[in-house]
Regions:
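Non-catalytic extracellular/periplasmic "stalk"
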Residues: 1-160
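Catalytic cores of peptidoglycan-degrading enzymes
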Residues: 117-286
Length: 286
């Protein structure tokens, strides 16, 4: 969710969302907030507060419930072994999550975000995915409609809707492409990780500043190194099928203040958001 408190001039912006501190930044038009609404966000009406000299702005924001759908995926034995390795998955998650939570104060990008690879998505954001062995495809499978998978490649699942089936929410979108196709940075940023992980395979993470990090999974090759500065349109890797992938494609994710959000919202962000310019007099978040 994008929010702007217009014409609010304060050297030390302070904002809260659901009674918890929320990073916010000065722009030439006011105070800008980008609030993560991951797929597992509770529905309801919540309070957004922006402190300002002489008082505060308080707004009630309603978050609607949404059904993201479910998907059953049948894997070869070797791929299923990856999905059923909670200890290794949790280890990788600890390493990756600390990077995804980076909150660098400078916004590095400008203009509309681009698509990292051309084409239509094959699986959308937030879909609940359940993983089975290929041999299970001939038997009847029952899902508990009241239970929900928790986590996004981030460790043990709880309340598993189907006993024995590893399950996660899809924390990004899948973009089918031929093996070796170029993957570009959708916006300017700095590469903060190039790694190899059990589920995401060859992975590149790019920090775009002010809590926004983009992720590229299952790469055949990475064409950048940690610390590289990239511009919008620069190549960061090539499409592959490393990690937990049944064929060549790019898993593309966007994380906001450490939480996954729908990448499509960043591609389709409103024009007023694109036009925001950081206040050069204040680049430090308070």
């Amino acid at each position: 969710m994008f929010a702007l408190a217009e014409d609010v001039a304060t050297p030390t912006p302070r904002c809260t969302w659901k009674s918890a501190p929320m990073p916010c930044y000065r722009t030439t038009d006011g105070i800008l907030l980008t609030i993560p609404l991951p797929a597992e966000e509770d529905a309801g009406t919540f309070t957004l507060t922006v402190e300002r000299p002489g008082g505060r702005i308080v707004r009630q924001i309603t978050v609607d419930d949404h059904a993201f759908g479910r998907e059953l995926i049948f894997l070869t034995d070797s791929l299923y072994k990856r999905a059923a390795s909670p200890r290794e998955i949790a280890r990788d998650a600890r390493a990756v999550n600390s990077i995804l939570s980076v909150e660098s104060p400078e916004r590095r990008w400008q203009g509309r975000w681009r698509e990292p690879v051309p084409g239509m998505k094959s699986t959308g954001y937030g879909v609940e995915r359940y993983y089975y062995r290929a041999t299970d495809s001939t038997r009847s499978i029952t899902l508990d409609t009241q239970a929900k998978p928790r986590g996004t490649f981030a460790g043990d699942t709880s309340d598993a809707p189907s006993p024995g089936a590893p399950s996660w929410r899809h924390a990004g979108i899948d973009l089918p492409a031929r093996r070796g196709a170029s993957i570009i940075a959708p916006a300017a940023g700095v590469v903060v990780d190039v790694g190899e992980y059990l589920l995401s395979g060859r992975t590149v993470l790019v920090d775009h500043g002010q809590g926004v990090v983009s992720a590229y999974f299952h790469l055949d090759t990475a064409t950048v190194a940690k610390g590289d500065i990239v511009r919008a349109g620069d190549r960061v890797g090539r499409v592959g099928s490393t990690g937990l992938a049944t064929g060549p494609h790019l898993h593309y994710g966007v994380y906001l203040h450490g939480k996954d959000v729908d990448p499509v919202a960043w591609r389709d962000m409103p024009q007023w958001m694109i036009q925001q310019r950081p206040d050069s007099a204040a680049t430090d978040r308070r």
